[in-house]
Amino acid sequence: MSHKEPSAAETSTVVHSEEDKAFCIGTGAVISEEREKEVLKNLQNSLTGKTAEENLNDEANHTSSDKSKSEDYQPSNVNVWALRKEKMIPKKHSHVKQEKRFSKSLQLQDPNVWPSPEIAEKQVEDRKLSDDSQKPLAPKANGKEKWVTITPNFTHTPISNRKSSRSRNDGSRRNGNGRRRGNYSSHGSNKRQTNYSREKDASRSIDSSNPSAEYRDDINNTFGSQTVSSANGKEVPQTSEDSSSQAPHHSSSSGHAPSQQGGNKHSYKKSDSQQSFHHKGRNTRKGQRHNNGFYRNIANNIQGPFPNYPVVVNGNGVNPYLCDVQAFLTSQLEYYFSIENLCKDMFLRKHMDDEGYVPLAFLASFNRIKSFSTDLNLLHAACKASDIIDVAIDLQSPMSIKVRRKETWSPWILPSESRLKFEMAKYPQINSSSSMSPLASSISNLTISPPFIPSSVDSIIKRDVQTEVEDKLTV
């Protein structure tokens, strides 16, 4: 490779620049920007081998070319966005759109698409003819399959001009709503009863007083002989057949049987009930009628007045009503001592003593408890039946019984400053005192009745009470 040696001008510039650098380094002076540019150009020229004259010519050519470009530039009228859209749309789709537009324009110009009214009518007629020709023809029917005309003959039953023999009032009279002949007068003139109606009424009364033999036998078999009180007060056994056959028909305007004189208070005469039942149907307008066998059987089956029996109890001798009330009381008292109620019932907590007890009479004064019962012994039994309530028994009087929550009773006790004293007076003084507190007046309605305990359970409860008292006395 041939190495080109630098010229005298290049060596001078290089030497000058090295001298400047040495001067700047030795003195610490600052070179200007123009001087730095010249130094850099000299270095580039020295490396490329160009002279200063060539550099000047290149600069002149560069400036002249820039001027010519600026003079030759003219704005074009081409829409760049339209050209870009054309480039984005493929050529196939553009041809299809153009063809559609062209076909639409041709269709609008075609007279077949928009025909005249005459041509349109002809086209409609031609379509109808073509549809009729395309329909399949019906098959020819043979002689057997032909329709045969049938002329129906209607026969109407003739309407009879004869009036019905039974009148309208007769039907309503059978139902118990119509008027009977001879009982009422219309326009001041009494209607006489015919022989036919009299015989009919007589037969009805006989049927009602004398039931059938089979029915009487059934009554004798089921009920047997009955005691009938006589006028002298003696009881005479008599069967239902005799009493029904020998019963006289007494007329009674009120519809009730005549009162009995002497004899048993609860003795009852079956014939009297039959008479009252019969005459009540005869004399009243809408009473029970005896023309139907159903009512006749009811009259024969009527029983006497019911005696006052005691309250029915179960086999163990326990009244179920008291058991239900005790269950309600137990659930209500358990709610009073529940955590849910103690969180919000401050009135109940204010009446607790140091051990958490509350007088049972205080709970008995609540309206909810009074709606169930006011018996303290029943309340005591309800508390003992609960698993949540603890009972403190005081043998002096049932009014001093106290109850509390069995478990976790200590957190609910309030300080002594916020407590309320429950002054419980003796039971007789509550009713006699005129000036009493509202709480004492609510307790005045309490009753102390002996507990309802069956004989079989009485001994067991007494043993439990004695053992509890002995345990407390020993402690």
UniProtKB/Swiss-Prot annotation:
Q: Which UniProt keywords apply?
A: Cytoplasm, Phosphoprotein, RNA-binding
Which terms does the UniProt entry file under GO BP?
A: cytoplasmic translation; positive regulation of translation
Please give the GO cellular component terms listed in this UniProt entry.
Answer: cytoplasmic stress granule; cytosol
Q: Where in the cell is it found?
A: Cytoplasm
Stretches with biased composition (Basic and acidic residues):
59-72, 119-134
List compositional bias (Polar residues) regions by residue number.
150-159, 220-242
Q: Where is the composition biased (Low complexity)?
A: 243-263
**SMART domains registered for this protein in UniProt:** LA
Membrane-spanning segments: none
Q: Which GO terms describe its molecular function?
A: RNA binding
Q: Which Pfam families match?
A: La (PF05383)
Q: Where is the HTH La-type RNA-binding domain?
A: 319-408
Q: Which SUPFAM superfamilies match?
A: Winged helix' DNA-binding domain (SSF46785)
Q: What protein am I looking at?
A: Uncharacterized HTH La-type RNA-binding protein C1527.03
Q: Which organism is it from?
A: Schizosaccharomyces pombe (strain 972 / ATCC 24843) (Fission yeast)
